[in-house]
């Protein structure tokens, strides 16, 4: 009796799961290429884990919460680690629509890959497009980064304006360079008229150049 029941179940599974069957998906793994010397052997334990991950993904779909590991069937398993699988309905002997299975796999693709230490290129669902990895969120909000950059620019601009004002004020306080030195040099210049040295006229003190005094003016007492 048990042998007959086992044979019946096997026959039903063979009818539901076979290459290119309705709602069936092919999976291909490249364990050696992904892990190198740390590659593991694909055995019945790995098959059980795969079925568990598919059942887990299906239980996330509305109205598919009753999906169990036994509802995930594998067939045509090869040594190069490729196989086909289908997901059967819990109450009836038919496979679930491919669209539901595909949606469930896509939503949990990262979880399935992580379970086998693989990625979308080394664990391939041939009829299911690869999903993009979620974008990395920066640890610091973007608006804080933008605010910090603007604040630094404004601070540098204010500092440059203050330094420029201080330099300009110092230049104004000193006045034009060389003016006082030129005046001093002009006062000390001694001119020569007709071979007679003449002192410049001191306009400030009313000094008279002796070179232009007559003999009477020089001898006339004050």
From Swiss-Prot:
Glycosylated. Glycosylation is required for plasma membrane localization and for its cleavage by BACE2. It is found in: Cell membrane. Keywords: Cell membrane, Glycoprotein, Membrane, Phosphoprotein, Signal, Transmembrane, Transmembrane helix. One of its GO terms (molecular function) is protein homodimerization activity. Pfam families: Collectrin (PF16959). The chain crosses the membrane at residues 142-162. One of its GO terms (cellular component) is cytoplasm. The modification Phosphothreonine is found at residues 214, 220. Expressed on the apical surface of the proximal tubules in the renal cortex (at protein level). Kidney; collecting ducts and proximal tubule. Pancreas; beta cells of islets. Expressed in the cerebral cortex, hippocampus, brainstem and cerebellum. Residues 1-14 form the signal peptide. Glycans are attached at residues 76, 93. InterPro entries: Collectrin, Collectrin_dom. Residues 21-222 form the Collectrin-like domain. Residues 163-222 are cytoplasmic. Induction: Up-regulated by high glucose concentration in beta-cells (at protein level). GO terms for biological process: calcium-ion regulated exocytosis; insulin secretion involved in cellular response to glucose stimulus; positive regulation of amino acid transport; positive regulation of L-proline import across plasma membrane; SNARE complex assembly. The record marks 125-126 as: Cleavage by BACE2. The keyword Nucleus does not apply. It is a single-pass type I membrane protein. Coiled coil: none annotated. Belongs to the CLTRN family. PANTHER family: COLLECTRIN. The cleavage site containing the double Phe-Phe motif acts as negative regulator of shedding by BACE2. Plays an important role in amino acid transport by acting as binding partner of amino acid transporters SLC6A18 and SLC6A19, regulating their trafficking on the cell surface and their activity. May also play a role in trafficking of amino acid transporters SLC3A1 and SLC7A9 to the renal cortical cell membrane. Regulator of SNARE complex function. Stimulator of beta cell replication. This is Collectrin.
């Amino acid at each position: 009796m048990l042998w007959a029941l086992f044979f019946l179940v096997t026959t039903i599974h063979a009818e539901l799961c076979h290459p290119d069957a309705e709602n069936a998906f092919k999976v291909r793994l490249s364990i050696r290429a992904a892990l190198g010397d740390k590659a593991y052997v694909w055995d019945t334990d790995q098959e059980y884990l795969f079925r568990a991950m598919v059942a887990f993904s299906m239980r996330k779909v509305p109205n598919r919460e009753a999906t169990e590991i036994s509802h995930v069937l594998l067939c045509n398993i090869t040594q190069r680690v490729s196989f086909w699988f289908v997901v059967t309905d819990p109450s009836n002997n038919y496979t679930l629509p491919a669209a539901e299975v595909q949606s469930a796999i896509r939503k949990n693709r990262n979880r399935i890959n992580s379970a086998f230490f693989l990625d979308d290129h080394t664990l391939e669902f041939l009829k299911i497009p690869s999903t993009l990895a979620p974008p990395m969120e920066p640890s610091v909000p973007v608006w804080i980064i933008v605010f910090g950059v603007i604040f630094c620019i404004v601070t540098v601009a204010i500092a440059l304006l203050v330094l420029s004002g201080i330099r300009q004020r110092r230049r104004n306080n000193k006045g034009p360079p060389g003016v006082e030195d030129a005046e001093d040099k002009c006062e000390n210049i001694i001119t020569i008229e007709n071979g007679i040295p003449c002192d410049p006229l001191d306009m400030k003190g009313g000094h008279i150049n002796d070179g232009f005094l007559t003999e009477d003016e020089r001898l006339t007492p004050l």
